[in-house]
């Protein structure tokens, strides 16, 4: 079989599989994210459906060989439509003992472990608490274990070009990529081209990585250790042109598209923050699409610039994560008072404070809804997947420009860094967005309103004859003059709320194939994939379960009350302590059952399946109470220096 993935293996047997879940794991400096990304690109070229889940520490260079320093990248590829990156890995590539120990509990019996045996030294084993080498003791007997001296083989491969030992060792991730590419029939020619382009200014580094990549492929082809290769056929996707895309990239593309649909400049004022920084980086490439990016000195300056751009007639955008939203809250309030369009992208992460910068969470919902002084309503939307970020960004722009309001667009770390195939849309079929600027010579009052949308009139500064001032003090309805009159303030508060309540949004769609489910699984944001996959599995077992996913969180869909009352049980899993459940219970007086998780990782589909079963057998409420009681009892019984081990408190 050639390096382009064509042909048949002369020695290894070929086995067809519908799907596979692979996890690459090693030190944060071992290149696991790049390795996973390249394997993802190879799978995309073959037409597989795929989903990815990166997981890495917050430190730029975490302590080598330690459990906190482990970086991993999980990908599921399949020959059918999938919704998640998979529950548990079928294959674990462990570059050192820490990677093995950190991920071993996630492996199902019979999974394959491919370990870089060169790194299983006495010192590295001791760092993570191994008294002996698990590759040799038999304690991995539940798994198919391949000990591969990746470092030694890589150094041997690059010896011919005189590469240094340091450069050779850095290329061992390419050896792992080559081996896995051989095993699953992935073409590596595109990865070779990528490496040569990436290191074009350092051809010796490029050559070392290419040689390592080929060495991994050739090792699989020639060794007797791997008796089987695997084939995952292309998925039957809707006709169209596809590309692999991450959530942050899709969101950036959506903002560019929105600017084109509205005929306005997009101005991003932003301060780099994990996990939202890629939006700033990506948008900076599109000056030719009338996009201006401004990397500010802090979060407050970023949103100030964005709001100023909106006042000047552009579409102002700022991107951040939870800590940044806290800092931006006063300017968001100013945008509410001045009734200017503004998009605030919040890529949520673990909190509070600095929290868990590289881990995912959904705990900013109440902050997005209410995190400002006074009655300060804003529209709130949530993306449900990486590719969905494109549509949600365009929709956020439509609402912001049409209704003259700030829009909080919620993503999270799992969506932002995850990737999946995205069918490139035909933008000619999308409706234009009308900013509806007041033209010179028209009747104008800054706070005169459209009777349908309640949006105020807006004249771009400098428009002849329409000079005006706005600011943070309360305005008189119509004229926009400063007003301290109580009755006017009451009117303006209610008008601003009515404007948000009246935003035109579609009804909530419910996936209930038989129309007779007893249980509704309700979600928002990145829970879409795990809930959807769990419902598919449950239905195959004969369980009647419905699924609905909220995109619009403020305002909520008009039919939501009817949907909630239609089902005897409504369960709402969230990566917080029940924030949306709290809102829905209060607004609709429906017994929405919250299911909470704040472990820094997204729900898995198998967890959701357990939640469905627990809801139907009546044990779900007890499970949730157990989580709270475990936290209190753990605090009372754990001594100094102790920590919660993996799996406790779930």
What are the functions of these language-model segments?
Residues 2-262:
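Active-site cofactor/cluster-binding pocket
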Residues 19, 156-158, 225-240, 258-265, ...:
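Gly-rich Lys/Arg/Thr-decorated short loops/hinges at beta-loop-alpha junctions or inter-strand turns
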């Amino acid at each position: 079989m050639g390096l382009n993935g064509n042909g048949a293996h002369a020695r290894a047997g070929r086995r067809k599989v519908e799907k596979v879940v692979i996890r690459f794991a090693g030190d944060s400096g071992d290149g696991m994210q790049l390795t996973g990304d390249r394997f993802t690109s190879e799978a995309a070229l073959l037409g597989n459906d795929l989903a990815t889940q990166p997981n890495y520490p917050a430190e730029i260079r975490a302590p080598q060989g330690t459990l906190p320093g482990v970086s991993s990248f999980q990908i599921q590829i399949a020959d059918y439509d999938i919704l998640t990156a998979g529950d548990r890995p079928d294959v674990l590539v462990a570059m050192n003992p820490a990677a093995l120990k950190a991920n071993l509990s996630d492996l199902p019996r019979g999974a394959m472990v491919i370990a870089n045996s060169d790194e299983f030294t006495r010192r590295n084993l001791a760092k993570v608490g191994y008294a002996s080498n698990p590759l040799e003791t038999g304690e991995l007997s539940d798994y198919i274990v391949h000990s591969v001296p990746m470092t030694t083989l890589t150094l041997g491969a690059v010896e011919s070009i005189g590469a240094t030992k340091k450069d050779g060792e850095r290329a061992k991730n390419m050896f792992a990529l080559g081996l896995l590419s051989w095993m699953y029939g992935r073409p590596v020619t595109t990865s070779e081209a990528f490496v040569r382009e990436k290191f074009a200014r350092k051809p010796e580094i490029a050559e070392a990585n290419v040689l390592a990549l080929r060495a991994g492929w050739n090792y699989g082809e020639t060794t007797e250790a791997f008796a089987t290769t695997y084939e995952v056929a292309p998925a039957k996707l809707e006709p169209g042109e596809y590309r692999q895309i991450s959530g942050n990239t899709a969101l950036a593309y959506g903002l560019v598209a929105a600017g084109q649909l509205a005929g306005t400049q997009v101005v991003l004022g932003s301060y780099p923050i994990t996990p939202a920084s890629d939006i700033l980086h990506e948008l900076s490439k599109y000056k030719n699409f009338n996009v201006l990016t401004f990397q500010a000195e802090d979060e407050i300056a970023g949103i100030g610039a964005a709001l100023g751009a909106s006042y000047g007639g552009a579409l102002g955008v700022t991107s951040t994560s939870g800590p940044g939203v806290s800092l931006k809250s006063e300017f968001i309030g100013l945008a509410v008072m001045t009734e200017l369009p503004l998009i605030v992208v919040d890529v949520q992460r673990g909190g509070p404070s600095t929290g868990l910068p590289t881990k995912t969470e959904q705990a900013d919902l109440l902050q997005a809804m209410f995190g400002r002084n006074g009655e300060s309503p804003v529209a709130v939307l949530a993306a449900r997947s990486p590719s969905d970020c494109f549509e949600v960004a365009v929709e956020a722009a439509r609402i912001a420009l049409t209704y003259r309001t700030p829009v909080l667009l919620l993503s999270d770390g799992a969506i932002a860094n995850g990737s999946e195939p995205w069918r490139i849309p035909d933008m000619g079929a999308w409706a234009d967005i009308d900013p509806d600027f007041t033209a010179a010579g028209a009747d104008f009052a800054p706070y005169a309103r459209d009777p349908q949308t309640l949006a105020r009139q807006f004249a771009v500064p400098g428009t002849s004859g329409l000079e005006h001032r706005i600011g943070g003090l309360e305005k008189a309805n119509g004229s926009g003059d400063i007003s301290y009159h109580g009755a006017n303030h009451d009117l303006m508060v209610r008008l601003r709320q009515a404007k948000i309540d009246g935003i035109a949004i579609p009804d909530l769609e419910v996936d209930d194939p038989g129309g007779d489910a007893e249980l509704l699984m309700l979600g928002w944001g990145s829970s879409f994939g795990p809930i959807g996959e769990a419902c598919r599995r449950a239905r195959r077992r004969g369980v009647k379960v419905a699924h609905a996913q909220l995109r619009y969180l403020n305002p909520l869909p008009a039919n939501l009350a009817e949907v909630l009352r239609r089902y005897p049980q409504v369960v709402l899993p969230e990566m917080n302590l029940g924030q949306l459940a709290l809102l829905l219970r209060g607004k609709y007086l429906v017994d929405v059952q919250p299911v909470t998780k704040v472990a820094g990782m997204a729900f898995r589909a198998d967890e959701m399946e357990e939640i469905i079963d627990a809801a139907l057998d009546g044990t779900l409420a007890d499970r949730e109470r157990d989580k709270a009681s475990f936290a209190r009892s753990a605090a009372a019984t754990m001594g100094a220096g102790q920590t919660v081990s993996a799996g406790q408190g779930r």
